[in-house]
Amino acid sequence: MESGPKMLAPVCLVENNNEQLLVNQQAIQILEKISQPVVVVAIVGLYRTGKSYLMNHLAGQNHGFPLGSTVQSETKGIWMWCVPHPSKPNHTLVLLDTEGLGDVEKGDPKNDSWIFALAVLLCSTFVYNSMSTINHQALEQLHYVTELTELIKAKSSPRPDGVEDSTEFVSFFPDFLWTVRDFTLELKLNGHPITEDEYLENALKLIQGNNPRVQTSNFPRECIRRFFPKRKCFVFDRPTNDKDLLANIEKVSEKQLDPKFQEQTNIFCSYIFTHARTKTLREGITVTGNRLGTLAVTYVEAINSGAVPCLENAVITLAQRENSAAVQRAADYYSQQMAQRVKLPTDTLQELLDMHAACEREAIAIFMEHSFKDENQEFQKKFMETTMNKKGDFLLQNEESSVQYCQAKLNELSKGLMESISAGSFSVPGGHKLYMETKERIEQDYWQVPRKGVKAKEVFQRFLESQMVIEESILQSDKALTDREKAVAVDRAKKEAAEKEQELLKQKLQEQQQQMEAQDKSRKENIAQLKEKLQMEREHLLREQIMMLEHTQKVQNDWLHEGFKKKYEEMNAEISQFKRMIDTTKNDDTPWIARTLDNLADELTAILSAPAKLIGHGVKGVSSLFKKHKLPF
């Protein structure tokens, strides 16, 4: 589903059967195929309030999510519909329709609370749908929001400063939209026109008083204002006054509905398509379809085990899976690019190392892009080990290819020489000179052959070594030479052989140096890209912390302006803690990153020193190649 899913109808994502929540594997399989970022819109509200109609409209259909034309609630659990996003390229719009809250047919009301909490955790835009007006009763019916502190955790362990875990909800909670259906009031306050958003904000103002009833009424208002910094309201007229049309609204054309209702619905959909955010987790981790599936499974498993869904734990679970996939993705990219770009044998080792460096640099970037929360760089080290092994394979293939190619060329060039030796053509007076001239022509022709690769000298050296006994025999049997001339020829041959061995050793030492420089370059590239990623993560964390502080300060100031001084003072501890967090993030930047990079540098040094075996391969491992590809001379 890289280019967008093709779901013709919604499927159940989370089943709610016999008071037990269960993730539907069919839905997970659909999400697994969506690697695009997702915009997730969830709608929640009392049953029979028309939630499904709005979701169908967002999907561009007038049917799909079951509407139900009776007082019986149709939707059970959470249903999902994935459609290509109409205005965000390469994004998928995931619509989540939840079963109606407060259904009298349901047994355990706790399931309503879990459905509500799951919708908050999974979506990036949370739509609360109610009827008629936002009044005291409507807010009381939204008591589920007050239970979120008991049903969701940001951190896996309590904070040492004693500040409530829920203070961090604002960093990952969705945008909050309140849709009011069959709205009949005038949008006015104290005789003055107001906007829909102003209507909502006025309804969320706290009521003065200390009695339990007032406090109970204020609690959902307070929670909405504290947990959801971005809020918006949409009101809708009644779709039609015709009861028959209402009962079959999924079969009714838009033209048969009230024009004002049509306009309001289109405005709502346009806002969702334009402003609904891509789903992210803390510190800017983008959620794709497959990641959303993992989150759903993780949260439901936590609920069924009797635990509370925890964002931190969910991110850790997600990171383990995603980082393993990132290692594989980056390593596969490296292999594919090397196979495409490198033509074996390379003329020099440096040519291969340069290509390796380029492909590795791009592969590291891919790993960085798709990994997160890589504690102690565990997965980056796995990626490095994998890449080093793959690099070693390419080095061996390059050497083997060079050996094969050079041997084939030498076989071709020395064919006449070998035939002359077999025929005894050099076993005559003056035969040694003739033999040497023939061998020199072979050497000249051999070095004219292009792109012989890294084993060119070594293969030719072995050829010369294979000829030493033959040359000695021809030399000693040549009656045209004096003993002194023969002795001089022997000395010259030994000297030339020693010089060629020195050249070969020099090449191997140079290649060792190139290998070590390449490893150092690899280490530095890994550290540089990690440093850039850590700095970006730190900047995102700082922005997140500043956002939490500013929102908390706004809420605190609002309490003061509305006359709730005690609530204002109660938030001082939270604000002080946010300021300390920001100071720590700002001031501990360099030491923290430096420590992480130092640790990685040590680990990479250990990893990269292991392929010393590969470096040494050029010195002591080549004999195995010659055993596999024996020379015929």
From Swiss-Prot:
Membrane-spanning ranges: none
Post-translational modification: (Microbial infection) Ubiquitinated by S.flexneri IpaH9.8, leading to its degradation by the proteasome, thereby preventing its ability to promote host defense against bacterial infection.
Gene Ontology terms: biological process: cellular response to type II interferon; defense response to bacterium; defense response to Gram-positive bacterium; defense response to protozoan; immune response
Protein name, entry field: Guanylate-binding protein 6
The entry's keywords: Antimicrobial, Cytoplasmic vesicle, GTP-binding, Hydrolase, Immunity, Innate immunity, Nucleotide-binding, Ubl conjugation
Reactions this protein catalyses: GTP + H2O = GDP + phosphate + H(+)
Its biological purpose: Interferon (IFN)-inducible GTPase that plays important roles in innate immunity against a diverse range of bacterial, viral and protozoan pathogens, such as bacterial pathogens Listeria monocytogenes and Mycobacterium bovis BCG as well as the protozoan pathogen Toxoplasma gondii. Confers protection to several pathogens, including the bacterial pathogens Listeria monocytogenes and Mycobacterium bovis BCG as well as the protozoan pathogen Toxoplasma gondii.
Family annotation (Gene3D superfamilies): Guanylate-binding protein, C-terminal domain (1.20.1000.10), P-loop containing nucleotide triphosphate hydrolases (3.40.50.300)
